[in-house]
UniProtKB/Swiss-Prot annotation:
<dbReference type="InterPro" id="IPR036779">
    <property type="entry name" value="LysM_dom_sf"/>
</dbReference>
<dbReference type="Pfam" id="PF00877">
    <property type="entry name" value="NLPC_P60"/>
</dbReference>
<protein>
    <recommendedName>
        <fullName>Probable endopeptidase p60</fullName>
        <ecNumber>3.4.-.-</ecNumber>
    </recommendedName>
</protein>
<dbReference type="Pfam" id="PF08239">
    <property type="entry name" value="SH3_3"/>
</dbReference>
<feature type="signal peptide">
    <location>
        <begin position="1"/>
        <end position="27"/>
    </location>
</feature>
<feature type="compositionally biased region" description="Low complexity">
    <location>
        <begin position="347"/>
        <end position="362"/>
    </location>
</feature>
<feature type="active site" description="Nucleophile">
    <location>
        <position position="423"/>
    </location>
</feature>
<dbReference type="InterPro" id="IPR051202">
    <property type="entry name" value="Peptidase_C40"/>
</dbReference>
<comment type="function">
    <text>This major extracellular protein may be involved in the invasion of non-professional phagocytic cells by Listeria.</text>
</comment>
<keyword id="KW-0645">Protease</keyword>
<dbReference type="InterPro" id="IPR000064">
    <property type="entry name" value="NLP_P60_dom"/>
</dbReference>
<feature type="compositionally biased region" description="Low complexity">
    <location>
        <begin position="372"/>
        <end position="390"/>
    </location>
</feature>
<feature type="domain" description="LysM 3">
    <location>
        <begin position="297"/>
        <end position="341"/>
    </location>
</feature>
<feature type="active site">
    <location>
        <position position="485"/>
    </location>
</feature>
<feature type="compositionally biased region" description="Low complexity">
    <location>
        <begin position="229"/>
        <end position="257"/>
    </location>
</feature>
<feature type="active site" description="Proton acceptor">
    <location>
        <position position="473"/>
    </location>
</feature>
<feature type="compositionally biased region" description="Low complexity">
    <location>
        <begin position="264"/>
        <end position="282"/>
    </location>
</feature>
Amino acid sequence: MNMKKATIVSAAGIAVTAFAAPSVVSANTVVVASGDTLWGIASKTGTTVDQLKQLNKLDSDRIVPGQKLTIKEVAAQKVEKSVSATWLNVRHAPDANEKILTSLKGRTVVKVESSEANGWNKISFDNGKTGYVNGKYLSDAKVAAPVVTKAVTHKAEAKVAATSTHAVKVDTNASTYKVKSGDTIWALSVKYGVPVQKLIEWNNLSSSSIYVGQTIAVKEAAAKAAPTTVKQAAPAKVAPKQEVKQTAPAKQEQAKPAAKETVKPAVSKPKAATPAPTAKPAVEQKASTPAVDTNAATYKVQNGDSLGKIASLFKVSVADLTNWNNLNATITIYAGQELSVKASAAKPKPAAPAKPAVSKPATSTPAKVTPTNTTNNSTPTTNVNNNTSQSSSASFSALYAEAKKHLGKPYTWGARGPSTFDCSGFTSYVFNQVGLSLSGNSATQYANSTKISESQAQPGDLVFFNYGSGIAHVGIYIGGGQMIDAQDNGVSIDNIHGNGWGQYLVGFGRV
C-alpha cells in the first residue's frame, strides 16, 4: 500500500514538473507545451492568470500546445526608420482624412514612438512635436542618422543667423519668405509647419520648383497679396519700357547732332541710360494699369517673360496657357507674341484633324488613282498618326477639366475614386468619366498603350515611371513637361523632370 502511494506521489511530481516547464522563447514570451495550464505558466513565470489573460486577450483559461503567450508587457522602444515614398504626409492623427501637419521627403529618417493597430506609426521630431504617418511607407533605417528635418532646419536657421539677427526674430511670424540658395519647398514646409500642397496653392505654383530670390507666402493671409504684387510689377517694368525704346532713340538721335556731335559722344551714353528717370513715372503708373491687366483676355509677350510668370500674373495655370494657345510641348514663346490668357479668348484648334474624313475615300480607291493624288495620299498618313490618341485635341479639354476637379484629393493605395485615388485609379477614373476606356494598374496601362517618345507626346497621353522593380507610377501628361497625377501628397500637378521624378521617368504611352 505504501509503495502504491509512493508511486502516485512520484507520478504527481512528474506531472507537476511537466506543467511547470513551458518552452521559454524569450524573457517576455513562452510557447505552450503539451500539458501546460495558465496556472502552471503563471506560477513558473511569477505572474497571475488574470495578467496572462489580459496581456494575451484570452476569454477563457483554455490554451493549446504551440500557442505563443506574452508573459511580460514590453515597454515601447523608439526606433529609427526611413521614408520609402517620394513624399510622405505627416498627419494630426492616425487616419488619411486627418489634417496634414507637414510632408517628409523620401529617405528622411524619423523616430517611431509607437505603432497603431491600423498600421499607422506615431513619430516625433527633435523639437518635441509629434505626428502620424502610414507605416507602409517606412522602412528600416540602415544607418542611425539624425533626422533630415533637423539638418534642414539648422541649415536654414544658420543661414538666417548669418544674414541678420532681425531675420531670425521675424522668421516664425513672417507671412512671406525670400528663397535663398539651398532652400526647397519641403524645407520651408517643415520650417513653417505648412503642408507642401498649401505652399504650392498659396503661391500659384505649377510645381514644387522654387528659385533663389523668389518671395514665397508662408501664411494663408499673404496668399492673396502675393499675386497682386506680381501683377503690378510686371506691366511696370516691361510694357512702358518698350514704348520708351521706340520713341526715345528718335529724340536722342535728333538732339545729339543739334547740340554736340564730337565733344560728348561718351556723355551721350549716360543720357541714353537716363531713360531711368522716364521709367520712374512708369513705376508710379502701376496703380492705374492693374484693372486692364487683370481683365484683359489677351497679353502680348514682353522681353524676359515666361509662361510661369504670365500664369501667375493672370491667376491661371501653365497648362491652361498651353491649351488655350495650342502651344507645343517645347513651350517656346517670344517677345511680341499675343497669348490668350482667358478661356473665352482661346485660339481655335488646328483644322488638320478634319482631313482624315477626305482621306478615307482616297485610301479605298483603286491603285490607279494613287499616282495622280500623291499629295492627298501623304496628308492622310500624317493625320491618321495624329489621331491615334483617344485623348488628343478636342478630347483633352474635357479630360483636363475632369482631372482638375480632383486636385488636392488624398492618396490611398488601391483606391479608384472619386473621393480618394492611387495613381492608376486616378487615370482610369478621369479617362472613363470623359468616355475613354482605361483600366488596370500602372503596369497594365503601360503594357496596353502605344509607346511614343517625349517629342511625340501630346497633352492627354500617359507618362510612366519605374522605381526599380517595374512600372510603378502613371500620370496624365498636360504638356510643358508637366503631369497631373495621384501621388503620396494627393492629386497634384508635378514636373516630370524635376523634384526627383526625372530619374525614374520611363516614357510615354498613348491610349
